[in-house]
């Protein structure tokens, strides 16, 4: 009871239980080092606040007893609470490090990057998934872009259920004729290191087949920007921002589509300093290397951005609850629109100037991929322009909203 308890791990998801009959806080590991999901009852929540690495089990017992109106909490119950958190990988302890190292080694040894969200975000059965995607694509009229100047599209990475109209609007612009291209997928790395970019050689395996990585291009990029790149980044194993794009690409183009998946870490330094992201030498070198690749490969590449926009409400640390397309979200839509105008104009600096004040209070998690794409296009396709195909907002829970949309990009003026 007198030894210090390891601190609660950073980076775990802590959210209110959505089930009225089971109140409390839910703990979940987005890195999937542990598969456990724990419910912390209301009376035990005060213990989480003092799991700082210096508190003892006696300190926890005292805090819990005080929070429960002076009613003594048994020491064996406190011990069970601590052991459960530790054994399930939620404390910064040796048990967690073993779990983490084991998962990293599993990913390193695996021949492919296997679907993480099949069976939850979308069907795990190939026939059922194909049927679902065909239905999704019928939600919007078929509008394949016949322009040879089409450079790429941007789509959400929110749940396909919540973002289906935007996904369909983006991927309806694609056709099997693009199958010979390599699809450069710039996805948000929700869990990656700041100012870093995650690469992998592993094929993305989904129920529809394997999307092989263009390894030669990946190696060239990694070699030319070694300080900026994390090879075989474990974040690929758990990240959804690229996985969802691969599934839609496989339906829109071909199941064995060839990809160059790039996870873009948060550009925190630019938000902290107010200086453009490529003021950071790692970011600048990566963008230069990507632009060099794009210059050489030219029309052999097609660009896909897996990006969401604003994150507003209680889930994201805001004091008020919000509802999609109501109240405060009208102002958010107007501010999103101003940023999208700069994106479509190819105005990288104008986009950044709207994002960085107040360290991006709209919390656009697509900021990194969008900035990297715009800056790369400035190098190789300075006349590139975009068009907004659809804008949406969705209540990810009863109190919180995510905004997102679909865009297309052209080499030059947008066709009428």
Q: What are these model-derived regions, one by one?
A:
Residues 380-416:
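Long, Lys/Arg- and hydrophobic-enriched amphipathic alpha-helices
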Residues 1-49:
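Acidic, low-complexity/disordered tracts enriched in E/D and polar residues
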Residues 22-24, 162-163, 397:
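Short N-terminal binding/cap micro-motifs at the start of the first secondary-structure element
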Residues 111, 116-375, 379, 392, ...:
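Active-site histidine-anchored catalytic micro-motif
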Residues 31-127:
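Long, charge-rich, low-complexity alpha-helical segments
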Residues 102-104, 270, 397:
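Short secondary-structure boundary/hinge segments and terminal tails
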Residues 19-21, 198, 256, 401-403:
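A short, structural micro-pattern
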Residues 14-16, 257-259, 382-388:
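Generic structural motif
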């Amino acid at each position: 009871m007198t030894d210090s308890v390891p601190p609660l791990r950073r980076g775990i998801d802590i959210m209110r239980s959505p089930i009225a009959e089971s109140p409390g806080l839910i703990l979940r590991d987005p890195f999937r080092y542990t598969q456990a999901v724990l419910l912390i009852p209301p009376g035990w929540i005060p213990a989480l606040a003092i799991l700082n690495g210096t508190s003892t089990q006696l300190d926890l017992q005292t805090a819990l007893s005080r929070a429960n109106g002076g009613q003594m909490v048994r020491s064996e119950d406190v011990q069970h609470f601590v052991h459960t958190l530790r054994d399930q990988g939620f404390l910064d302890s040796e048990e967690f490090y073993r779990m983490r190292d084991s998962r990293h080694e599993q990913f390193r040894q695996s021949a492919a990057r296997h679907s993480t969200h099949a069976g939850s975000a979308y069907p795990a059965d190939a026939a059922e998934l194909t049927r679902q995607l065909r239905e999704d694509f019928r939600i919007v009229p078929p509008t394949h872009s016949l322009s040879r100047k089409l450079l790429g599209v941007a789509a959400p990475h929110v749940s396909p259920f919540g973002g289906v109209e935007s996904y369909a609007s983006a991927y309806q612009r694609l056709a099997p004729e693009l199958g010979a291209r390599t699809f450069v997928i710039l996805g948000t790395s929700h869990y990656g290191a700041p100012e870093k970019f995650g690469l992998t050689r592993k094929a993305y395996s989904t129920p529809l087949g394997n999307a092989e990585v263009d390894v030669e291009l990946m190696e060239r990029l990694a070699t030319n920007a070694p300080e900026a790149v994390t090879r075989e980044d474990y974040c690929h194993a758990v990240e959804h921002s690229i996985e969802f794009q691969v599934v839609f690409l496989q339906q829109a183009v071909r199941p064995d589509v060839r990809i160059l998946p790039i996870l873009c870490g948060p550009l925190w330094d630019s938000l902290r300093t107010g200086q453009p992201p490529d003021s950071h030498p790692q970011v600048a070198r990566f963008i230069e290397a990507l632009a060099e690749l794009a210059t050489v490969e030219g029309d052999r590449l097609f660009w896909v951005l897996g990006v969401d926009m604003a994150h507003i409400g209680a889930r994201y640390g805001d004091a008020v609850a919000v509802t999609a397309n109501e109240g405060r979200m009208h102002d958010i839509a107007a501010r999103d629109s101003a940023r999208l105008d700069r994106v479509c104009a190819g105005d990288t600096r104008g986009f950044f100037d709207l994002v960085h004040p107040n360290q991006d209070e709209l919390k656009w998690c697509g900021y990194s991929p969008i900035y990297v794409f715009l800056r790369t296009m400035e190098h190789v396709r300075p006349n590139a322009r975009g068009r907004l195909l659809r804008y949406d907002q969705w209540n990810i829970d009863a109190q919180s909203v995510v905004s997102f949309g679909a865009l297309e990009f052209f080499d030059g003026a947008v066709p009428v």
